[in-house]
């Protein structure tokens, strides 16, 4: 999803596609030049090198070790470099150059890919893929502080009064990284070709249900290949959700062929969102208080 949204912001990609599906990821996921410089300097320091020329001679093993070390360094919040805070990925694409002049959201606001029809959305519990255990209150508050979203946490606590710290962390990180960027992309395209929004809510039964509607779970549904090796482990025990896969796959194919997935386009008035689950339906402006909590933050 991040890659598709980035391509939509690249002038050199203009005219190469008529439809785009930034799936589980949209805007907000590039680095500015100054952040990229910090990442590059740290990466080279890990290798004990000083230039790109020297890097070309480094072994693949050494590069991978340095990459992991650099990722860990920025994941700890040390040398924080962009608006993702403690969840930063240091190896995002870099904007502010000829290939990617602006970040994807600014590009969309300026009319980039305005003739391209877009289908975008996210899964309800994206970040359980990286966090299925217990979460301390301290970790929750530290993460939210990194997002500068303490007020948003208060809103989620009101809308989810029975939620544990772990549940709140999953909800907030999912929205910060996936749902809100997709919404911002759709909002930025109000005068462009239609944008359609979905949310995948079907819960995996694997690991006693701990994954819920996690990141990438929607992929075998969209491609209608639930029978592929390994997918059953991701789905968990129980009857096959083939009916949902048929429905979702048809929507994706219809959108690819015609630009229409089968539900109303997203706008700032109705915010129509297709919920994919055992029972699927269009919901207008889901979780409005939580969405509004990110205004001015994300």
Q: Where in this protein do the model-derived segments appear?
A:
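Short glycine-enriched nucleophile-adjacent loop
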Residues: 2-13
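A short, mixed-charge helix-start or loop-turn motif at secondary-structure junctions
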Residues: 23-25, 167, 233-238
């Amino acid at each position: 999803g991040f890659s598709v949204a980035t391509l939509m912001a690249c002038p050199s990609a203009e005219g190469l596609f008529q439809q785009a599906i930034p799936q589980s990821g949209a805007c907000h996921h590039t680095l500015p030049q100054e952040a990229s410089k910090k990442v590059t300097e740290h990466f080279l320091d890990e290798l004990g090198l000083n230039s790109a020329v020297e890097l070309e001679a480094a072994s693949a093993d050494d590069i991978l070790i340095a990459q992991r070390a650099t990722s860990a360094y920025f994941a700890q919040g040390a040398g924080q470099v962009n608006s993702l805070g403690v969840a930063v990925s240091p190896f995002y694409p870099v904007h502010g150059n000829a290939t990617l002049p602006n970040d994807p959201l600014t590009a969309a606001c300026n009319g980039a890919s305005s003739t391209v029809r877009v289908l975008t959305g996210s899964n309800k519990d994206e970040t359980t893929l990286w966090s299925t255990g217990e979460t301390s209150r301290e970790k929750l508050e530290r993460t939210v502080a990194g997002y500068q979203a303490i007020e948003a946490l208060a809103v989620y606590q009101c809308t989810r009064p029975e939620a544990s710290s772990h549940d709140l962390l999953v909800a907030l990180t999912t929205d910060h990284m996936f749902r809100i960027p997709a919404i911002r992309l759709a909002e930025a395209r109000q005068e462009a070709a239609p944008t359609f929004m979905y949310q995948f809510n079907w819960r995996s039964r694997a690991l006693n249900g701990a994954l819920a509607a996690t990141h990438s779970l929607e992929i075998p549904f969209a491609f209608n290949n639930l029978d592929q090796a390994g997918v059953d482990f991701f789905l968990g025990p129980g009857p096959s959700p083939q009916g949902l896969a048929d429905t979702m796959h048809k929507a994706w194919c219809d959108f690819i062929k015609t630009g229409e997935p089968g539900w109303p386009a997203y706008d700032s008035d109705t915010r129509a969102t297709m919920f994919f689950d055992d029972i699927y339906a269009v919901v207008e402006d889901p979780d409005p208080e939580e969405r509004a909590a990110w205004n001015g933050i994300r």
